[in-house]
Amino acid sequence: MKVVKPPTNVPQLPLDWLIHNISYEAYKEENRHNEVVYEQGVEIEHVRVDFSKSNQIAGLSDSDRYDAVIFIDAVNSMNVPDDFISRSKIYFSGKAYKIVKVIPCFATSNSVHHWEIEVV
């Protein structure tokens, strides 16, 4: 028996849901002094930044850690680079974050539908 998948039209992330702007500086290299070098920043418009708070316990002390997931749509977000690189910097609300995970999400084709980027 052959399974026939129905065609799907997956809508893009809604523009009214993409309420934030970020600045992205792509990781370039480490120079000979072990300093990280970044590309010139680009402003990406119409993204969503969702924060989460976790408590980390190390020995006798504990601290709060703020992580975020950034949603970037392939159609509705503006000034989107072709790819995102781990170790790159994201600036949001005056604070710098480092990309630790890039998840390209595909809907029904080989082209990216949106990205989910985890930062710390």
Each model region followed by its residue ranges:
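Short, conserved turn/kink motifs that form compact alpha/beta structural patches or helix kinks used as
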Residues: 2-3, 26-120
